């Protein structure tokens, strides 16, 4: 009733949070251990019953669960410090196998749910000095610690990310 009274026409519902948990049964991820039902499906159905659209949120750049399982997928600063000693979330590099993991989650949501869009957060052009980014630049004969080279690679990595997401959604 509150949504109708407030003339709300769209609400963002969660597939995956910054902690990395899915809010629905998932083969591409793990469902939140405290959840015993498909919260995403219930939210979408309830919203659609009253004419409210439901874009689905996936935290793309942050996934603490996978960051701890695969620290080699983390985005690294030039000094190569991960930053575990500081509170907060740790960003993942889209030039790592994490991108395949994320694409599988996006495909699963688009294929299995009547969503009205996808909201991917914490993404953009980034500089990174993880082993994948350093290797890419070295393989190209470039100095990986030259900021201009790192920025140019960051633009290519983001372009590849956007292309892969678009291709995944268009396939479904």
Q: Where are the model-predicted features located?
A:
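Acidic side chains
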Residues: 1, 38-41, 63, 116, ...
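Aromatic- and glycine-enriched glycan-recognition loops and surfaces
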Residues: 1-6, 27-50, 100, 104, ...
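Aromatic-lined carbohydrate-binding/catalytic grooves of carbohydrate-active enzymes
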Residues: 4-39, 62-79, 83-86, 127-128, ...
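Short, well-ordered coil/turn segments that N-cap beta-strands
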Residues: 7-9, 48-54, 114-116, 171-172
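Hydrophobic faces of well-ordered beta-strands that scaffold small-molecule active sites
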Residues: 11-13, 54-58, 118-120
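Short C-terminal domain-edge/linker segments immediately following a structured domain
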Residues: 17, 42-43, 85-89, 148-152
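Active-site-adjacent "subsite" loops/lids of carbohydrate-active enzymes
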Residues: 56-113, 163
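Active-site neighborhood of glycoside hydrolase catalytic domains
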Residues: 91-172
